[in-house]
Design a protein with these regions (language model features):
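Membrane-anchoring hydrophobic helices of lipid-metabolizing enzymes
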Residues: 1-84, 97-99, 109, 127
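Soluble catalytic domains of membrane acyltransferases
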Residues: 69-197
């Protein structure tokens, strides 16, 4: 790869960077298994093929790569004007996040931002739509300012208030408890909140 700005999935490097103290204790077969279950090679082919796509165009390319079809009910109820915080359950992780961002991004002409795990900032096509949250270490000093700027911006915000994708509990897939941050900040700023169900 000659393009230094192109991020490719490198499970080995991610583990070294995000867990430097524990990395030497991780068996190589575990690293190989992780590469296989995250489909490192397939995703890297996609990232290379979509390297020129940014924002909602990148989300559209993701939908194609995932061969995902979206059946949206009630899109006519989405307001055209005003600023909103869209909150949703997160049953599938990446796929539902991509789909929700794609639908809202198309509706609001690309003016959307997600609060996301900071690892996703490595995806150049997705990064313009992201406000990063560090889920594995200390938050950056400017994190509260970044969140405040997101709520103050003229972008629609997308949040998954459980903070993680849904978990299986007693045989049922459901979200973890939702954090109230989106309600508190939305009220402070004067944004309406819209609950979406995926």
């Amino acid at each position: 790869m000659t393009d230094d700005s192109l991020f490719l999935i490198d499970v080995d490097k991610i583990l070294r960077t995000k867990a430097p103290k524990h990395y030497k204790y991780i068996p190589k077969f575990v690293v190989s298994y992780l590469k296989k279950i995250v489909h490192q090679d397939e995703i890297n082919v996609f990232l290379n093929e979509s390297k020129d796509k940014l924002g909602v165009d990148f989300l559209e390319a993701c939908m194609g790569f995932l061969d995902a079809k979206v059946d949206v009910k009630g899109i006519e109820n989405l307001p055209k004007d005003g600023l909103y915080t869209f909150v949703s359950n997160h049953p599938l992780g990446g796929q539902d996040g991509v789909a929700l961002g794609y639908v809202l991004g198309k509706h609001y002409e690309g003016k959307v931002k997600y609060l996301v795990n900071d690892l996703l900032m490595n995806l150049r096509g997705l990064a313009p739509l992201c406000i990063p949250i560090n889920k594995t270490g200390k938050q950056a000093k400017d994190f509260p300012k970044m969140v405040e700027a997101g709520f103050q911006s003229d972008d629609q915000l997308i949040m998954f208030p459980a903070g993680l994708c849904s978990r299986r509990q007693n045989g049922v897939i459901r979200d973890l408890e939702w954090k109230k941050t989106f309600v508190v900040k939305s009220i402070q700023i004067g944004r309406a909140s819209c609950r979406e169900r995926v």
